[in-house]
Amino acid sequence: MLTLDGVPFTSVPLKINTSEKEYVDVASLDVDGMVADLLKYKGKSGTACPGPGEWIEAFEDAEYVFCVTITSNLSGSYNAACVAKDEYEKAHPGRKVYIVDSLSAGSEMWLLVEKLRELIQADLSFDEICQKIATYNQHTHMVFSLESIQNLANNGRVNPAIAKIVGLLGIRMVGIAEDGRLAQKDKSRGEKRAISDVMKNMKEQGYAGGKVLIHNCQNEAAANSLKEQLLAMYPGANIRIGKTRGLCSFYAEKGGLMVGFEDGQA
């Protein structure tokens, strides 16, 4: 069990599979090495979600458990966690598990995890935490900018016809997490335009200077540029930069940005 600033915390990893190797999305994964491998790999690849047993193992002996899962519309993780919840609560009367379907991924999920930490440390009741995190989930969003979406297309997450366009002549796909699915909003030519379109889509979803987490896949320069431009408009905003982990690096691919943020009502 890990800790998140004093709160017991662990992750239940998904897996990235090729015919040559399996990559488990844990903190020790060499993400840069995985990205380099996948750039050279020409065969089929895919992902696998954790099963109920892996969730139950992660619950350990906790009285109260809060889970945040990747969107149920793109992964079986949420359903597996629900099965685990039912089995765990049946086996341990009085213990409770609450599952948050993020309807998103990556940086937006991390906003939810950080909010849960805040609520737990405020010593609220289980039911109060459930209510407040459900409300907060309605006011977090994600915008992304991708230089390549081949892995998304290969795994049925986006239209293959769109994948053929993205990457040609410097075109990037800018989109949002909408109702738990990836929705294309712009085809942006060049990184400068893509960053501008990311900011435009953030404003359209109600961004007004709240917390922002910018996760990048080997593109820290773009992440810093976005942060600087946001701070120019919203001085003092809490904006942090991080790196995508295994699963998000697989789908965002080299050069990708995933931007999780709070709207003005969070």
Where are these regions (language model features)?
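Mixed-charge interfacial surface used for oligomerization/domain docking
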Residues: M1-K21, L74-S77, A81-D86, Y98, ...
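Conserved phosphate-coordination/catalytic loops
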Residues: S45-G53, R189-R193
